[in-house]
């Protein structure tokens, strides 16, 4: 099924400011990816700023990849402030199943903050859903569960949209579910490629006027198409792929999304 691009042009027109509380591995890549797409990144995790920064932003990303110092406190404060001013909040629960501290952090965030989108790999979403899964650190790992059912369960439980990233991406808001069949096997070879997808989703949500399911679906299609284009002619050249991905995000057009997007609903 083909899709019509609605939000990419709005990102380029509105240049939304995306507040990222992200990990030290992903910060540079996420910031440059947002710039390439047409959004503006703001990378701040200083707890003393968290009552102000969300008020000047159009979306917030909370990424727990490298929890350091007062990050947890900053995430909670930023999330609450974002909820107060009504901007969408994206949660990337990196490696949530790996340690008790990560699990406790996610439990507290989900209890205290209303999220528009939870974006993670299969292992991370299975952990949030309470399903058995053999995660490998912050990587997806392996398991034998129905991932569509996991996405729907988490979406219904927390009243949000869910995106499970993988060879086939799953998007659900608990009532409607779609799968995205674009992408490349090089994505898992580049660290923070999933973190950048979360930031890209935030940019799409920022201009969506509350239509979070359709915005997440288009964000996923757009990003995975950019990955396909970046991977053309490459096999193991992951360094070139990373640079090309930024180039393809900048070159991406609504027409390309409409022509190349492969989704099932």
UniProtKB/Swiss-Prot annotation:
One of its GO terms (molecular function) is ATP binding. Substrate binds at residues 43, 192. The keyword Iron-sulfur does not apply. Gene3D superfamilies: 3.40.1190.20. It is an enzyme of class 2 (transferase). Keywords: ATP-binding, Kinase, Magnesium, Metal-binding, Nucleotide-binding, Thiamine biosynthesis, Transferase. It catalyses: 5-(2-hydroxyethyl)-4-methylthiazole + ATP = 4-methyl-5-(2-phosphooxyethyl)-thiazole + ADP + H(+). ATP binds at residues 119, 165. The keyword Oxidoreductase does not apply. InterPro entries: Hyethyz_kinase, Ribokinase-like. GO terms for biological process: thiamine biosynthetic process; thiamine diphosphate biosynthetic process. Its EC number is 2.7.1.50. Its cofactor is Mg(2+). Pathway: Cofactor biosynthesis; thiamine diphosphate biosynthesis; 4-methyl-5-(2-phosphoethyl)-thiazole from 5-(2-hydroxyethyl)-4-methylthiazole: step 1/1. Catalyzes the phosphorylation of the hydroxyl group of 4-methyl-5-beta-hydroxyethylthiazole (THZ). HAMAP family: Thz_kinase. Belongs to the Thz kinase family. NCBIfam families: PRK09355.1 (NF006830), thiM (TIGR00694). This is Hydroxyethylthiazole kinase. The lineage of its organism: Bacteria, Pseudomonadati, Pseudomonadota, Gammaproteobacteria, Pasteurellales.
